[in-house]
C-alpha cells in the first residue's frame, strides 16, 4: 500500500484545496486505503487500486483540456463511499460527495460534484429508469470519469505495473 497511499496523498495535496488534510484524515480513518470495491477489485485495497487506475487512464485520455486538479479530485474521490463496507449502488455517488464535502469539508466545484454524483449513470444515453439523469447535460469531466471508471472495472491493471508508473510520476514532480 505504501507507494499507492503516498501517490494519492501527494496528488490530493497538489490541488491545494482547503480542508485537504481533513479529507486525508477521513480517508485514513474510515479505511479508504484498505476498502474493497463492490463489483470489481473485490480485495483489500481494491478501492485504492481502482481509483488510481481511473486517475491514470483519465490523465492519459484528457483530450479536452480539463484541469488536472479536477481530474485528480473526481477520480480519487468517486468511490470514497466504499469506506466502511458501504455497498448500496443506488446511493453510491451521493454518499461519496457527502463524505467529501459535508464530513470532511472539502470543496468540490460544480463539474467535480456532478461527475462524482453521476459517475455510475450514463452507461447508455438514457441513464437509469426513473432518474433525472440526462447525459447530454453533463460535463467533459463526467464523461472522462465515466469512461475511466468503466475501463478500470473491465481491465484491472497488475499492481506491479501500477507501482512502476507511480514511481515514475512521483519522480517527475
Where are these regions (language model features)?
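Metal-dependent phosphohydrolase cores
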Residues: 1-173
Amino acid at each position: 500500500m505504501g507507494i499507492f497511499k503516498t501517490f494519492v496523498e501527494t496528488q490530493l495535496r497538489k490541488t491545494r484545496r482547503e480542508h485537504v488534510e481533513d479529507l486525508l484524515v477521513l480517508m485514513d480513518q474510515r479505511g479508504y486505503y484498505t476498502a474493497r470495491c463492490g463489483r470489481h477489485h473485490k480485495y483489500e485495497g481494491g478501492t485504492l487500486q481502482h481509483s488510481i487506475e481511473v486517475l491514470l487512464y483519465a490523465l492519459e485520455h484528457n483530450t479536452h483540456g480539463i484541469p488536472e486538479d479536477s481530474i485528480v479530485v473526481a477520480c480519487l474521490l468517486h468511490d470514497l463511499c466504499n469506506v466502511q463496507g458501504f455497498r448500496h449502488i443506488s446511493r453510491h455517488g451521493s454518499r461519496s460527495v457527502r463524505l467529501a464535502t459535508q464530513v470532511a469539508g472539502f470543496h468540490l466545484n460544480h463539474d467535480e460534484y456532478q461527475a462524482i454524483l453521476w459517475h455510475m449513470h450514463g452507461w447508455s444515453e438514457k441513464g437509469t429508469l426513473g432518474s433525472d439523469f440526462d447525459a447530454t447535460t453533463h460535463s467533459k469531466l463526467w464523461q472522462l470519469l465515466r469512461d475511466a471508471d468503466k475501463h478500470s472495472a473491465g481491465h484491472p491493471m497488475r499492481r506491479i505495473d501500477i507501482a512502476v508508473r507511480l514511481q515514475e510520476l512521483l519522480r517527475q514532480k
